[in-house]
Amino acid sequence: MLIIPAIDLKDGKCVRLKQGRMEDDTVFSDDPVATAQHWVNEGARRLHLVDLNGAFAGTPIHKPVVEAIAKAQPELPIQIGGGIRSLETIEHYLDAGVSFVIIGTKAVQDPEFVEQACKQFAGHIIVGIDAKDGMVATDGWANVTDVKATDLAKRFADAGVSSIVYTDIARDGMMQGVNVEQTVNLAQYSGLPVIASGGVTNLDDVRLLKGKPGILGAITGRAIYEGTLSLREAQLLLDQNTL
């Protein structure tokens, strides 16, 4: 299991939002490439990038920044989400050295697109499911749908999706702890590996997720930026065989 640092990009800077509200941001760095290097130095084995402007615009805004990070970290698996609505965009990111592309809103609106992407880019597609009270949210979390997160995950079980990033919106950026039950439930219901996101605040949260069936990793943002969680300590804990 991996601890995956999040680098959320807004207006060229690294920020953290509270519950996905663009106006409620905290800027942590104005140099995303240096931030990526910092987390690599701290022992990161994968990076989670989000183009926040892209998520709201419906098209990538931070391509040059993402490319620069991928170029600087050629050996490191990188996953990118935010504004990915076309096969051309996916191809562009993969050609630039990104390992995984996360399809979010488009997966809800057009499930066939995900199936098509999985065929064309086998092994590189992650579905991002953002949910509030178990219901899927889209368009940068601005719109809560009547689609159940578990149903959406199940829909892609046989499509060739490599994993699911599951974000509990109510907990994201709020430092309230991770929703272990819903995350494990999603993994078991869909049969797909799940990366937990939203609310990973300290080592206790990491312990709660460790060893749970179907959990591939946990994304953490505000906690590692504000220092309530050490990336190095968390990964060390996960690498130990004991719970």
Swiss-Prot record:
Active site (UniProt): D8 (proton acceptor), D130 (proton donor)
InterPro entries according to UniProt: Aldolase_TIM, His_biosynth, HisA_bact_arch, Isoase_HisA-like, Isoase_HisA-like_bact, RibuloseP-bd_barrel
A single cellular component GO annotation: cytoplasm
Keyword annotations: Amino-acid biosynthesis, Cytoplasm, Histidine biosynthesis, Isomerase
GO MF terms held by the record: 1-(5-phosphoribosyl)-5-[(5-phosphoribosylamino)methylideneamino]imidazole-4-carboxamide isomerase activity
GO BP term (any one): L-histidine biosynthetic process
Domain of life, per lineage: Bacteria
Pathways involved: Amino-acid biosynthesis; L-histidine biosynthesis; L-histidine from 5-phospho-alpha-D-ribose 1-diphosphate: step 4/9
Catalysis: reaction(s): 1-(5-phospho-beta-D-ribosyl)-5-[(5-phospho-beta-D-ribosylamino)methylideneamino]imidazole-4-carboxamide = 5-[(5-phospho-1-deoxy-D-ribulos-1-ylimino)methylamino]-1-(5-phospho-beta-D-ribosyl)imidazole-4-carboxamide
CDD domains: HisA
Subcellular location, record wording: Cytoplasm
Pfam families: His_biosynth (PF00977)
Signal peptide residues on this chain, from the entry's feature table: none
The EC number(s) this enzyme carries: 5.3.1.16
Main localization of the protein described in the UniProt heading: cytoplasm
Stored HAMAP family: HisA
Family affiliation: Belongs to the HisA/HisF family.
Protein name as catalogued: 1-(5-phosphoribosyl)-5-[(5-phosphoribosylamino)methylideneamino] imidazole-4-carboxamide isomerase
Source organism per UniProt: Acinetobacter baylyi (strain ATCC 33305 / BD413 / ADP1)
